[in-house]
Amino acid sequence: MPVINIEDLTEKDKLKMEVDQLKKEVTLERMLVSKCCEEFRDYVEERSGEDPLVKGIPEDKNPFKELKGGCVIS
């Protein structure tokens, strides 16, 4: 997709672009923010038991666990 410098466009072209964008946006389904937040909260809470950031990673399956023993140079 080519980059368009908006300053190089005529006023008519700018208005046409705006109308095209508004035509795209008018077809989008809109929802109340309160309803979306409620659904999002429910979604997160339903899956929190599977989330490793919430429940943690078992020590035996943790790929980032520090290896025991090492070389100490004195």
From Swiss-Prot:
GO terms, molecular function: G-protein beta-subunit binding
Question: What InterPro entries does the database record attribute to this sequence?
Answer: G-protein_gamma-like_dom, GGL_sf, Gprotein-gamma
Q: Any idea where this protein resides?
A: Cell membrane
Q: Could you tell me which residues are lipidated, with the kind given as S-farnesyl cysteine?
A: 71
Name the domain of life: Eukaryota
The record, for SUPFAM superfamilies, names:
Transducin (heterotrimeric G protein), gamma chain
- Subunit-level organization: G proteins are composed of 3 units, alpha, beta and gamma.
Q: Does the keyword Lipoprotein apply?
A: yes
Q: Which Pfam families match?
A: G-gamma
Q: What is this protein called?
A: Guanine nucleotide-binding protein G(T) subunit gamma-T1
Residues that bear Cysteine methyl ester: 71
* Primary location class: membrane
User: What's in the GO CC field?
Assistant: heterotrimeric G-protein complex; photoreceptor disc membrane
